[in-house]
Each structure stands twice: as C-alpha cells, then as structure tokens.
C-alpha cells in the first residue's frame, strides 16, 4: 500500500482506511505508532521512542529519518462537513488545523482549509471556546486536554463523537451519550488508546466578542488578584463574571504588574467591524523579534557561543532588530550594551561577541533586575504611564470569535519560542494558590535571587470549566472540589535559554504545592517532571494520584492496545504502564 511521506520522517495516510492498514502493519511488526499534530507539545510526548535522544522541547525537528517506527501526520484527513443542519452537527477529520498553522510540518496549512474558517464561512457556525492559539490540529488539541480561559464554556462541550483506530487496527466509535465511559476515556488520551481520525462536533451559531486588556499595578487592578481585599472583587469573582479571560502576571522585582484580558460574547450584527486585539501594544509590530533577542542574550550569558550560532543559523532574526530599533537609550543601562551586542552578532566570527559578553556579563547579572524592569516598561508599560489619548485607558477590542478568542495567534513561534509547564488547581483555591506563589517569591529579599524564582518572563493565569474526560486536567465527578472548574498557571520559559527548565525552573513550583499537599495536575502536552531523580519520581506519583479514573483508563488501554504499539518509554514511565504481558 503506497503511503506518502515527508522526507521519510512522517507517514501521511491519505484516508482512514490507510490509517487502519498502517496500524495493522505496525501491530504485526511490533512497531510503535504515534501521531504528530502541530508539534506544539513537548517532543517526547508526541513521537515514538526515536526522539528520546533529542532534547524534549516544543516545535522540535521531526524524528530521525532512520527510524523504523511510525510517526503519522493526518494532514490529508482534514475534511469538514455539516451532516445535521438543524442540530449544527459537523464531522471533521482529526488532522484539520483549528486555524492557520505557520509552523505546519507539512506546509499545507492555510487559513482557508482550517476548521474555524470553514465552519464560519460555509456554515455560519463556530465552537464555544478556544485556547490562546489555534495552530493545533483537532486531534492534537483534544488529545492533550488543552483549553482556553472560561468557566462558562468549554471546547469539550462541542464534542459528541470520536472515531479512532485501536491498537489492533479496528475502527471504533465513541458517542458521548451512548458510550459514555469509552467517550470520556478517549477524549483526553494522549494517543495511548488509538489514533483519533474523525471527530463529531455540535457547533453553535457564529458569534462575536468584545473586550479589553489593561496593564496595571496590583493596586490599580479592578479586582484583588490575591483575594485579600474586602473592598474589591476577587480573582474568582473575575473568573465568574467574564465569559472569557486571562491574566498575564509579571511578579519580578520592580515590575509587579498584571495584564488582565477579558471578553464577553456578542450576537452577530449587520455591519460589525472587527477591531483586533494587539499584543505588546507599545510596539505591536516590533516587540517579538526584539524581545526574542534580548531574552536570548540574558539566557545565554554563560554560554554566548550558543546564541551566536543560533543567530548565524538564522534561528534568531537579528535583522529584524537592526531594522526596527533606532533608539537604544530607551533600554536604560542596558541600551548601549544591547546596541553593541546586536552589532557584534552580525560579524563573521564569534570572537568579538564572546569577548564582549564575557567582559560585561558580571555587570549585566548584577544589574539584571533593573535591566529587566526597564525592558518590560518599554514593551508592557502600565496604562497609567502611557502618553497621548491612550493614557490611563485599557486596550479595547472586538472581533469575530474564532479570531478574537485565540489572543496569542499573532505571536510567532519563530520569535517567541516558549516552553511551558502548566499547573491546574481547583478554582476554589485561586486565592490560596496566588498567595502562595506571591509569598514564595517575596520570601527572597535579594532581587537577583528573586528572579531565580519568578523567572524572567510572565506567568499566564487562566481558568477552565470542569470536564468529565477521565484524564482531563480539569476532571471532576461533580462530587469533588474540581466541580466548579480549575484555575491554572504556566510560568513561561524561552527555548533559547541555555538551561533546562525541567531541572532548573519548574521543580520549585511542583514541589511548593506538593509539599503543602495542595491538589494539582499537570498539562499532559507540556513539561512533566524528569524521572531520573527521586524528586521527579515523587512528583509524578503525586500527580498520578490526582486522577481518580487513571486505573480505569489504564485497564481500558490494555484492552484496546494489547501489543502496546501506542506506548512509548516516556508514557510508560510517567503513567506507570505495566510491561506487555
């Protein structure tokens, strides 16, 4: 059976029948099978064992072409068809991207062949809720339990049926009402129960959103982020009041600010004119490449050759900085050094750049809190510090829902290549979680050491509606404290930083809440604990205990995939999947 491939790294089945044939062949040959969507998850979570010798980062190069294992891409299974007009029921191939994916491994993704575009323009329909980006494929977004920011709406509410190929090559169907256990098991299953090939969605009529984003100090914020004020609404009140929301938190010394984004639904009206949201409104067109190079410099002070090589390889767009930054003085004490570093990065050899970094890195490190505060004041100034007609006012926006809800869609994977670990908590603990984080940060009085705790970039804070999916991070049986939904936060880490955040950064957060016996879960597609040390093993054991249906999931997994063709060493170790037989 001919199956097209990309550079021999991926198999690209033309149809569901080809997926079935590939799985049956893998079953006979004892090969692993995994599926890549948009490669937005950690690479070890996506691919077969062939990538385990490569770094575990997002947006990684594909598996080695020498691999005999099967890494599938379902870009050709991307149909979208309305099959029940009255009930807004749609069938969609699992390989269809939610929106345009600029980093699509097949380079076939367009806005016009995306799920949201086709729903909107062909059927005047949409889905209830979306994440911060829509680069993902439908199957990938479901498989990792990803979500946007809402306690009222959930993408899971749109899913009514799932077609998947199990480990023996049988095409199975799970219906939300008729096969509740199977449906809720496969809904968030990380590819461990089979290959999701088609999804049935109950969509809703197209709608718009309107909203605002403020940049404020803790004191200026309209709600009390830490839940300690008797006069202001709480963070939980904010979550409950808005239809959709997110807060970007900058907890670093000298910065301490919040960037709450909020939106409400609006009905479609004739003559509606979108006013799209813009990130980094001070410099919306320039911010990303400049932030990228600044953070790459700050994250590689002890290994400058690594940064130089990335620039020379074209991985970091130094030309964008040269073309767009004309006033280096706005960066304060870092301005002149930044200008010289940019110039040295363009030279044919690394000697001068390395020498300059080595000569100045002690000064940069000592002044890092001041440098960072000045950088953030340039790109994320307080509304009260703005000039002109925007002074003191939040950014106001309105848009069609599929393009307004994913507020980070314009963020470039090239410029802002970010890694995450995302911690989910019962939403009723919102104030407790934020207070614990703040107190942990503030207990370190040395500004430089405090930056080691906060990191150099922002922390995203979202909420999510409860889910019945067995391995959803927001799973609830409606009798537990998760029933009202979840609050979640993710400290952001640049891929271009030299250190490994799974060793250097994220364990402090995992341990803080584990040691206080605060229930939390980790996003399956993002960074999980390393298991080469006892501490990581203990953390993962703690995480597994937060899933009441995990044992049921693993038992069902064994029945659906007895030869364990979907099980990689990564998932075996993290979920404690018993060996075959």
State the predicted function of each range.
Residues 1-581:
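Noncatalytic alpha-helical scaffold of FAD-dependent oxidoreductases
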């Amino acid at each position: 059976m001919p199956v097209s491939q990309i550079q021999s790294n991926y198999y690209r089945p033309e149809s569901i029948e080809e997926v079935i044939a590939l799985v049956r062949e893998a079953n006979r040959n004892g090969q692993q099978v995994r599926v890549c969507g948009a490669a937005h998850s950690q690479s070890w979570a996506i691919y077969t064992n062939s990538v385990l010798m490569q770094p575990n980062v997002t947006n990684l190069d594909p598996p080695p072409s020498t691999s005999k294992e099967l890494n599938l891409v379902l870009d050709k299974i991307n149909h979208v068809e309305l099959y029940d007009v009255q009930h807004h029921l749609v069938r969609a191939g699992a390989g269809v991207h939610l929106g345009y994916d600029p980093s699509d491994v097949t380079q076939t993704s367009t806005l016009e062949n995306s799920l949201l575009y086709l729903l909107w323009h062909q059927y005047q329909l949409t889905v209830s809720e979306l994440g911060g980006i829509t680069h993902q494929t439908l199957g990938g977004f479901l498989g990792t339990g990803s979500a946007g920011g809402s306690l009222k709406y959930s993408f899971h509410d749109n899913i009514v049926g799932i077609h998947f190929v199990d480990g023996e090559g049988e095409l199975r169907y799970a219906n939300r009402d008729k096969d509740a256990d199977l449906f809720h098991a496969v809904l968030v299953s990380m590819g461990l129960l089979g290959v999701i090939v088609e999804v049935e969605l109950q969509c809703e009529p197209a709608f718009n959103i309107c909203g605002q984003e403020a940049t404020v100090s803790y004191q200026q914020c309209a709600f009390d982020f830490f839940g300690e004020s008797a006069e202001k609404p709480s963070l939980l009140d904010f979550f409950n009041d808005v239809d959709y929301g997110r807060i970007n938190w900058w907890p670093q010394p000298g910065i301490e600010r919040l960037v709450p984004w909020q939106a409400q639904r609006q009905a479609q009206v004739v003559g509606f004119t979108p006013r799209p949201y813009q990130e980094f409104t001070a410099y919306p067109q320039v911010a990303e490449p400049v932030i990228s190079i600044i953070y790459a410099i700050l994250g590689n002070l002890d290994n400058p050759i690594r940064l130089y090589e990335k620039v020379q390889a074209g991985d970091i767009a130094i030309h964008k900085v040269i073309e767009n930054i004309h006033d280096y003085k706005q960066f304060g004490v870092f301005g002149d050094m930044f200008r010289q570093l940019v110039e040295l990065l363009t030279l044919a050899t690394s000697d001068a750049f390395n020498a300059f970094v080595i000569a100045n890195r002690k000064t940069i490190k000592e002044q890092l809190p001041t440098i960072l505060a000045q950088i953030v004041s340039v790109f994320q100034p307080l509304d009260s510090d703005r000039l002109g007609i925007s002074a003191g006012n939040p950014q106001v926006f309105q848009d069609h829902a599929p393009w307004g809800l994913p507020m980070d869609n314009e963020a470039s994977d090239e410029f802002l290549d970010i890694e995450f670990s995302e911690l989910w908590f019962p939403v009723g603990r919102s104030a407790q979680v934020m207070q614990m984080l703040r107190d942990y940060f503030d207990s370190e009085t040395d500004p430089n050491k405090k930056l080691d705790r906060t990191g150099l970039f922002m922390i995203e804070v979202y909420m999510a509606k409860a889910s019945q999916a067995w391995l959803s991070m927001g799973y609830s049986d409606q009798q537990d404290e998760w029933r009202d939904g979840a609050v979640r936060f993710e400290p952001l880490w640049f891929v271009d930083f030299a250190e490994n955040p799974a060793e250097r950064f994220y364990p402090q957060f995992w341990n803080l809440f584990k040691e206080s016996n605060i229930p939390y879960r980790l996003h399956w597609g993002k960074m999980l604990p390393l298991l080469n040390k006892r501490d990581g093993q203990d953390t993962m054991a703690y995480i597994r205990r937060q899933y009441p249906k995990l044992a049921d999931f693993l038992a069902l997994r064994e029945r659906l995939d007895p030869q364990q063709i979907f099980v990689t060493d990564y998932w075996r170790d993290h979920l404690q999947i018993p060996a075959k037989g």
